[in-house]
Amino acid sequence: MKIPANGFTHAGKFHADDVFATALLQILRPDIKITRGFVVPDDFDGIVYDIGFGMFDHHQEPRETRPNGIPYAAFGLLWRVLGPGLVGERQARLIDENFIQPLDLNDNTGEQNSLCDAIGFFNPVWDSKEDQDACFFKAVAVAKQILENQIESANAVNRADEKVQQLSLIHI
């Protein structure tokens, strides 16, 4: 999937799913321009996620769920399409199972998750003068570093697997 130049997600209080979804899009297209709003403009040309009832919005019925019953949130929906291209099918599945599913579960059910809580603390408090979008992008910067580390780790495992496979062929 080619990442367009523009992205749109919901405004207001943000959560780990839209923050990590944005981080993923920035990793794949560093120059992407993300807009936050409450209504997707009719003439918007780009990728829309966590709003708008499209392919990457989980706020619609029936909710898409994984075979294990965990419902997708925006990050999981994007990762399902984009993750394998970054780390391969096997590592994408493992990252989904171990990292993304707990975030998606929190977003859909309120299940306790410390990382989701930490991302949530970037939201400005009720009497703050901070710009909500600026707070969102601070959270995205942290999420992006975490996700880049996840991707690098997964690709290191892929390189190690290849090396072991090469060595095993030599010794046959």
Where are these regions (language model features)?
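Short, glycine-biased loop/turn motifs at secondary-structure junctions and
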Residues: 62, 95-98, 153, 162-167
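Conserved small/polar residues in nucleotide/adenosyl-binding loops
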Residues: 170-172
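Internal active-site segments that recognize and position negatively charged phosphoryl groups
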Residues: 133-161
